[in-house]
Curated annotation (Swiss-Prot):
GO terms for molecular function: copper ion binding. The keyword Cytoplasm applies. It is found in: Cytoplasm. Pfam families: CutC. This is PF03932 family protein CutC. InterPro entries: CutC-like, CutC-like_dom_sf. Belongs to the CutC family. Keywords: Cytoplasm. It comes from the Bacteria.
Length: 247
């Protein structure tokens, strides 16, 4: 049966994903940035409370995946922290300035991760040669690749996803970006064995007092009075589709 990984941005998200049938959780912060390294406090609390496998993302900032020496040093420190806290895996990725997998840095990441299962995230979708990148990551020992097939969604990138699945069993190809119940059958039909979905929704803040016109974001139009949450019904619906597909 295909694995359903749900991207979670808080303890509440993780609890809802677990309750509604997720098989694994990718733990992140900052949904507006596409996922950044969670805080130590969130890591500890989720590690203690959630029984599902949880793979934290290690990503120091938004934007591209070509990092300074200082940023990369911080990533290695975070990887060691994730390992020491006892997580079974992590999600990360680095590219060089030419859009290739940064092999020297990935070797350091793999050494720091040790026995942890490493997922190479959607930096893969920004690399110059995805076929060579798939081969390189396999040689490095990366467990899986999260990809939309180098398109804006996994549905649009189904051609490359199918090609990479046919190329071999390792690294595992996990389809992600825009995955939902409506297009999940298409991915399963293509032979995808792991899918990644945020199954997310924005909910209104519990704040009754509102101070309009003041934002904590660089975007003056950002809405401070909403929060990101996992939609449990969406998770359960996708899990139901996967379970029925098996039968």
């Amino acid at each position: 049966m295909a694995v359903l990984e749900v991207c979670c941005y808080s303890m509440a998200c993780a609890r809802e994903a677990e309750r509604c049938g997720a098989d694994r959780i990718e733990l992140c912060a900052a949904p507006q940035e596409g996922g950044l390294t969670p805080s130590y406090g969130v890591l500890v609390s989720v590690r203690e409370a959630i029984t599902l496998p949880v793979h934290p993302i290690v990503r120091p900032r938004g934007g591209d995946f070509c990092y300074t020496e200082q940023e990369f040093a911080a990533m290695l420190s975070d990887i060691r922290m994730v390992r020491e806290l006892g997580f079974p895996g992590l999600v990360t990725g680095v590219l060089n300035a030419d859009g290739q997998v940064d092999i020297p840095r990935m070797k350091k990441i793999m050494a720091a991760a040790g026995p942890l299962a490493v997922t190479f995230h959607r930096a893969f979708d920004l690399c110059a040669d995805p076929r060579q990148a798939w081969k390189t990551l396999g040689e490095l020992g990366v467990k899986r690749i999260l990809t939309s097939g180098q398109q804006s969604s996994a549905e649009k990138g189904i051609s490359l996803i199918t090609e990479l699945i046919a190329a071999g069993d390792t690294p595992i190809i996990m389809a992600g970006a825009g995955v939902r119940a409506a297009n999940l059958p298409l991915l399963l039909q293509a032979g995808v064995k792991e899918v990644h979905s945020s199954a997310g929704q924005w909910l209104p803040s519990d704040m009754r007092f509102r101070h309009p016109g003041v934002s904590m974001s660089a975007d003056p139009d950002a809405d401070e009075y909403r929060r990101y949450a996992v939609n449990g019904e969406a998770v359960a619906e996708m899990k139901g589709i996967i379970s029925a597909w098996r039968s």
